[in-house]
Amino acid sequence: MYFARELPRRHANAFHHISRSEFDQLVGKVDQLIQRSDSVDIPVQFLKITAAVGDAHTSVQLPLTKARFPVRLYWFGEELRVIRATTAAQSAIGLRLSAINQTPLSDIVARVREIISQDETPWYFEDRSPYLIIRPDVLHALGIIDDLKQAQFAFTTDDGAVVNLTLAPVADQIADWHDAYSSPPLYLQHNGDAFWFTALPDAKIIYVIFNHYDWLFFKARKLFSFLDNHADWKLVIDMRGNGGGDYHVGHWCLIKPILRRPALNRHDRLFVITGRATFSAAMSNAAQFRTETNATLLGEPPGEVPNSYQERKWFFLPYSHLQVNYSARHYKFLSTDVRTLMPDREIDPNWSDYRAGVDPVFKYLMSSATE
């Protein structure tokens, strides 16, 4: 199999999590599954191999899908709740997913774990699994649904009542979406912005949403120009929505300027927020904030292990033309081999705050500013 030959050859160390014999055995099992699978299932079957390799930069790129089931899910502790839905599924907002086509959530989770990188942090699974659970092709390949055009979803209310809905996939761009909150918290108001900041004069805080690295050099210059005129203000850099890019750019444009400003580089003046979706270069920069600055880290731990295989490269399979991603290099961002970049103060999302449009991290920052 071309895939089984090329992935170990190109990867920096394809056997850092599983042995060569385990890899070969899994390849044999997946090859048999592929022979019996519908074409729509094949990419997901390959994911079982890349997930076992362990690092999240190694994966098979699933085909772009125009339609997913019309709910958006989010883990709050052990509860997987509906945080967004179309009009057809609006009655499910706020409810807990309990089953799909009579397959209980616990079984769904077990099957989805097989296709998500198995050597990253638990927060990586929390970030990735809700996206996969609403994909018809994934559910079909995992034996949860037979019909790609509809499925029966079972939800549970807080009172324990079961709500059954038959849902059909829908394209994001044509759907009429409804959110669990009436007004989004600040950190969700600028998802489309790569880098955005605002002044909060009452708290003397400059709040930055850092989602991506595009044009960071120019945008960061504006940020520090403002900060230099507000020398006693705090700086909060929110990286919860940052899935990566070039960590060298983040280091050069943000960390180096902070190091040149000792009055800002203090644990009570500099704050960095991370979350389950903080990944790749963003995780790297968060680790550098920990090791090189005096920043206080808040929020959830990032989804990626700080010392791990990264730097994504890819090749294409000759017949299916599927894109196979792999890690080309091992990076070490912390001196000790800890599994998780733990925040100084861990603040987890909770359902009661989310539905009220309240950000618990922002709430903590504002309460600290008034103390």
What do the PLM-derived regions correspond to, one by one?
Residues M1-A4, T157-G160, Y187, G192-E371:
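C-terminal "post-core" interaction segments
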